[in-house]
Amino acid sequence: MTYAFDPLVPRDIDRPSPVDVTRPLDEEASLAMDEAKIFAAPADPAERPAWRRRLHEWREDSRRRHAYRGERYAHPDARWAAGCSTVAQVWLWDELLFDFTAQRFTPERLVEDARERFGGLDAVVLWHAYPVIGIDQRNQWDFYRDVPGLTDLVEDLHRAGLRVFVDYNPWDTGTRRGRDDATELAALVADLGADGVFLDTLKKADPELVARLDEARPGIVLEGESKLAVARIEDHAASWAQFFADSDVPGVLRAHWYERRHMQHHIRRWHRDHSEELQSAWLNGVGVMVWEVVFGVWVGWSARDSATVRRMVRIQRAARELLIEGDWTPLAPLADAAEEAGVYASLWERGGVRLWTVVNRGDHEWTGPLLSGASSPVVTVPGRGIAAVAEADDESPDWWPGLARAIAEADHDRDDDARFPHRPARRIAPPALPRDDDAPDPGPGVDLPEGPYALTVRYRARETGMYQGAPYVDEWKPLPPRLHDARTLQREGLLAGRVRVAATEVTAGEFRRFVEESGYRPLVPTRFAGDEGDPDAPAVLVDLEDARAYCAWRGGRLPTEDEWQLAADDPGFRRSEPAVWNWTESEHSDGRTRFVMLKGGSDRGATGSDWYVEQGRQSADYAVKLLRPGLGLGRSTAIGFRCAWDLDENVAPHEEER
């Protein structure tokens, strides 16, 4: 197969835009500059004064053309966004934020981890539905509304000093329909007390949606994905600078140059080296999105990049007034030796204070005079790193001592370890539940012999990946056919003893009998199977723990995903009506995300978007990686289960994986 693009290099739309200073800034040239993500910088220092003048000319002209007022940024409830240096996108069920054993949120763990490694967060996006949505007819609002204690979680995060974004998925049109999206989102924002809305896949919100959200939460901060149109900087206080490629000599972010109070968050979600994003953020006085778990995949930041964030935000927070209101000189003149070493700086000036935010594009540490002249300060800049130099006149503002202290502290906080912090997913041994020795005979099933096996597993390449590792590494923008295409993997293992897999799924009537006779009560009853419905239909609205408990009551256990597949090839293996996905004993965790493998496919589910979990009956060799939600949200009308029994005594119940 020949790909139409190289995923390891930026696409044309990701690249910085050159600035033509050889002709007057007419309407055509000004409109062209409106479309930039980053204004590319000239390599020749002699060309930079004209380049800076052109940036000023464009900003003045563009603001005139768009009749810019900037009222959004003056709103008391929106001002915080201008100082939001770090935002983290966090899956609600990230194991830093949620304890699966206790079934409770643990915001204190998330906050402490971020403080130690990143210098603390300013905001979080509570990601909720994707990539689980589509497994059944629940819509994106259900995946917030059904969460017990979500309002308490938001309040806890607020008490910890963090702002909270909720996520809006405009592509969710194939699940159950309720009220229109604007009504649902506005109500959610009001009920949770959310500070902002992250606009998934949207560069900007419709004006009507903005108005509805403003009614629910005056001053609401909207953050779109990717490039924000100049005209909408007026009512979007932040934007997501995703996959913004910089020029070799660092350039200027167009949206932030247009409005210094507009916060942008750099992010290249699949990259393992974030130094270029961090340097661009540092030189432009903006922030970054710290995103270490991308839809269930670990993409953790290196110790070097984490330390860079700590150093950066310590100074940015101390210098916020200077960075927003001071005079900004991009690519300020430096000593020739610094320029030759690939060292560049922005200069920020206000109230007799001068701050140089410095970056080193080279791979090796550089030490030398920053400026021309004998009185120049000497600076050390780590390879691929940042530094800061500041000086003040005798009459300095009251924030100057805090800034000087922050710079001194940052100088002692660095780490040169740029290795990727791998985090393998491990299979979780199921809890040892008491089995009923008097349970009736398992009944009809498919008997699997002991011994080795090899399987081919088919799956769709989603952003969730499969068992280990990220599906994309250092890729700019995964697109079809790299995204959502059909793939295979091979699994090898050993059955240590004979296993019988039930011929059919457990029925709703059988599960009700279990609940009545055993007195079983789940730790969290949210969405737990009710007493109504066809007793001969497959049991649904059962979580993994519920299914395990039932099978133990029957003297068995859940089959592993491999046992399920081996049995499903036998003519005696049957599917119930309607078909539902089957839980398997395949729970894994990398310490941040829990997932299982579903088998079988379902007659239920959502259609209309590739972002949904696939629906429809699937072949025996097909698998879906499902991220585990907590607090009962794993209970689905489209997921049932069947049991398995070990036919030989004193045999470990699970196969070895290789």
Where does each model-flagged region fall?
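Structural recognition of the beta-strand scaffold that forms the well-ordered cores
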Residues: A88-L92, D122-L126, V164-V166, G196-L199, ...
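Aromatic-lined carbohydrate-binding/catalytic grooves of carbohydrate-active enzymes
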Residues: L110-D206, G519-G533
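Active-site neighborhood of glycoside hydrolase catalytic domains
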Residues: G149, D156-R159, D172-W240, F244-V249, ...
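Active-site-proximal substrate-binding groove within the catalytic cores of carbohydrate-active enzymes
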Residues: A43-R48, R52, R217-G219, E223-P369
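Alpha-helix capping/hinge segments and adjacent helical runs
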Residues: S586, G591-V624, L633
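Mature N-terminal, pre-catalytic/accessory segment of carbohydrate-active enzymes
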Residues: M1-D122, V379-P382, D393-A439, E649, ...
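Extended beta-strand/loop cores of jelly-roll/beta-sandwich
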Residues: S396-E563, A568-D569, D621-R658
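Short, well-ordered junction/capping motifs at the entry into regular secondary structure
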Residues: D562-E577, S589-M597
